[in-house]
Amino acid sequence: MSQEDITGKDRLQELIGADYRLQWIIGHGGMSTVWLADDVVNDREVAIKVLRPEFSDNQEFLNRFRNEAQAAENIDSEHVVATYDYREVPDPAGHTFCFIVMEFVRGESLADLLEREGRLPEDLALDVMEQAAHGLSVIHRMDMVHRDIKPGNMLITANGIVKITDFGIAKAAAAVPLTRTGMVVGTAQYVSPEQAQGKEVTAASDIYSLGVVGYEMMAGRRPFTGDSSVSVAIAHINQAPPQMPTSISAQTRELIGIALRKDPGRRFPDGNEMALAVSAVRLGKRPPQPRTSAMMAQAEAPSPSESTAMLGRVARPATITQEAAPKRGSGIGIGLFIAALLAVIIGAVIYAGTTGILFNDTPEETTTPETITETYTPTVEETTSQWVPPTPPTRSTFTEPETTSHRPTTSEESTSEEPTTEAPTSSRTVPQIPTSTPRTSASVPVETNAPADDLIDAVNGLLDVGGAQ
């Protein structure tokens, strides 16, 4: 560590005070730097997220983030990373220095796990979804919304426990001007249609994002890809997701189809109903329909199962090492990226105005989609005793190779197939996963009729600030 780094750490330590002793930087996000630290009072390791000055100087952001951080201290769930403390301290320059103290989790993010494995067996993926849904149910009961559910914000511990992190940061981010240097673009791949259009975000928005995560875990690809964040957001608003592989059970495909409905009023309304639905599917049953009498009970915390133990063995808790500080010029690079994205938006608006391709949020008549069967050929015998991770497919941030295309469809339920018979009770065994997965993308034209200016509003709804995946 250079003398300059040591001096900077010492200055930061003075602001944080004697209750926490900084060790080293373990991560950087668009809004903050994360330090590993010792909680001297409680004798435990913690993660301290230090907000960047450009955000803590924004009063509207500060008010929102303060409210969310203080509310998060009251969240008590094994499946949500705990928030221990939040403080604001004036620095010598007269600015407000903000930091939040959180539970330090020795685990691997779901994003890293999927990057390595490609996809997960159905039973493991459903286990992840049920645990995450239960964590969301606690958040939603407090009338709060996470707003940024994605694999990068889901940690898996060595004993298979799933924990949601980065709670409450996206809401505060909406207060920051879009052109501020150092911003990063929100995660378009997991954004709900209403969030992409700048409409009201509710608990059902988190359910949509969790549905996208579930789709990706089992299909080995995201439902929507594109050349840019804008094109992905438009796909979330207008296109029906491609059908999931038929190797996935009908009841699980139906579950994901309900979660990915465009109309938030027709999805599971909150984490509690989602947890109940996933629990039913794990027992081999069809998911109950949202807002029915079967969904009135409170979901019980999922008990550790064989798949939970297997999940812990698959996850690889990261070795905690010191991370280099970002280069001073990194903010300029991000600023250029924002400028490029805005240029894409302007071009999209011009194109929309000349071709009639606009937004439409009204339900369209359902047509019968062409059924495309995806064949999976295992290279090893299926086993119920141990899962051997496959060779992961190549993953891409936005685009993926198209091997099969679906005809245009206006049905938002194309991922949901009605099973003709009741599925047998699950034995909760871990299936063997194929080592090679055909990957497909839907090619669906956008046909809409809302005002052209809505394109900018829709994209503005996307540009939330979030942590790095």
UniProtKB/Swiss-Prot annotation:
ATP binds at I26, G27, H28, G29, G30, M31, S32, T33, V34, K49. PROSITE patterns: PROTEIN_KINASE_ATP, PROTEIN_KINASE_DOM, PROTEIN_KINASE_ST. Residues 365-384, 399-413 have a biased composition (Low complexity). It comes from Corynebacterium glutamicum (strain ATCC 13032 / DSM 20300 / JCM 1318 / BCRC 11384 / CCUG 27702 / LMG 3730 / NBRC 12168 / NCIMB 10025 / NRRL B-2784 / 534). This is Serine/threonine-protein kinases PknA. InterPro entries: Kinase-like_dom_sf (IPR011009), Prot_kinase_dom (IPR000719), Protein_kinase_ATP_BS (IPR017441), Ser/Thr_kinase_AS (IPR008271). Gene3D superfamilies: Phosphorylase Kinase, domain 1, Transferase(Phosphotransferase) domain 1. Residues 20-281 form the Protein kinase domain. Residues 430-443 have a biased composition (Polar residues). The keyword Nucleus does not apply. It catalyses: L-seryl-[protein] + ATP = O-phospho-L-seryl-[protein] + ADP + H(+); L-threonyl-[protein] + ATP = O-phospho-L-threonyl-[protein] + ADP + H(+). The keyword Signal does not apply. One of its GO terms (molecular function) is transferase activity, transferring phosphorus-containing groups. Its EC number is 2.7.11.1.
